[in-house]
Amino acid sequence: MTTPVRTRFAPSPTGFIHLGNIRSALYPWAFARKSKGVFVLRIEDTDVERSTEQSVDAILEGMQWLGLDYDEGPFYQMQRMDRYREVLKHMQEQGLVYPCYMSTEELDALRERQRASGEKPRYDGTWRPEPGKVLPTPPAGVQPVLRFRNPLTGVVAWDDAVKGRVEISNEELDDLVIARPDGTPTYNFCVVVDDLDMKITHVIRGDDHVNNTPRQINILRALGGEPPVYAHLPTVLNEQGEKMSKRHGAMSVMGYRDAGYLPEAVLNYLARLGWSHGDAEIFSREQLIEWFDLEHLGKSPAQYDHNKLNWLNNHYIKEADNARLADLSKPFFAALGIDEPTLAKGADLVSVIALMKDRASTVKEVVDNAAMFYREPNPDADALAQHVTDAVRPALADLAAALKACEWTKEGIAAALKATLGAHKLKMPQLAMPVRVLVAGTTHTPSIDSVLMLFGRDVVVSRIEKAVV
């Protein structure tokens, strides 16, 4: 019987969560769903000084927005301290750890001497018990750290799903501190206990954790466990080629929602930011689950491309249900001072969204372009002077009369425009541009008949008549 796949996302709630961070949730989530396995959420909050409830909320909110549902958790490391102490006690009883009284100052001085002589700076095992070795006398009043007895010989090796075979000599590794002087366990120890207890089979995480992996494998084996499959993801770079970070201008995950991106577009883009399925650029959440595998994870850093994300978001906006987009648009209208009562009194919002969405990269852009339907026109003086000329006023007057009488449909409005053009021997731009300026306050709109139909007969006629009276 095969072991069920169990993956995890284990963020530290110490601030900002950007696309590079949340990708480390997407891939294990997709792999668990593909494998009909279990996806676990674990909050690694042992850094008490930097961990905040606000950061936890940002992680949960970002995952929920993208639809990354978890099966177990969230588990909080700070709530598992009794379990860590229990394992530490077992390790002490088994001789797997030992107390070390070397002070920070002594350790710094040791490393300086090692650097000066061309050695790799590392703890030298001063307090490590060995047969026949006489240990220094513990200093009075000093609480020791606990160090793990790392094997002195041999090799730690694993077949990384991204990096291939990785081998590290144990001689390269010193004895890791796994408990601080106050007894609190350290990160690398907690991770191992959690992965063992939660029966994690696949660890899919950023390659900044590669250096931790041999140490974690040795602790895992000392506790009688077998290492999971590791897949260390290359870094996500920003558009300037730097590692994505808040310091280098990365946007938070929820910042994309607030800028008008759809979650399905961000999910699709994020999936392609380090994984591929042939030449497929656009795929649904269901297709991602069907296709996802570890074999096609990229081996090189992935670079964020904002234009590509905009292209994808435009695709999903065009495909999206108009009523859903109308609901999503309301906060963006509110930011422009257009409240819901104003929207209700103006042109039908769902119809406006349907007309305006195709050219927009974000919901915010849809709203910016659609705001004209809910505001009084405020055309630029140059546009008025250029397009609303004395020569065209007679045609505008006739058009207003024709629009009063025509059937108020796209076809009826188009017929009124065509008749006016014919009577005054004008070309469409000569009439359509002044009408756009007078009715919408701008020269940039979709087809004039569609726009006028949504504004409504009374608004259109009154705005044209004001200019020709």
From Swiss-Prot:
Listed EC numbers: 6.1.1.17
Gene Ontology terms: biological process: glutamyl-tRNA aminoacylation
Class of the enzyme per the UniProt entry, highest EC level: ligase
Entry binding sites for ATP: 246
Entries under Gene3D superfamilies matching the protein: 1.10.10.350, Glutamate-tRNA synthetase, class I, anticodon-binding domain 1, HUPs
Protein location: Cytoplasm
Family: Belongs to the class-I aminoacyl-tRNA synthetase family. Glutamate--tRNA ligase type 1 subfamily.
Protein name per Swiss-Prot or TrEMBL: Glutamate--tRNA ligase
Organism: Paraburkholderia phymatum (strain DSM 17167 / CIP 108236 / LMG 21445 / STM815) (Burkholderia phymatum)
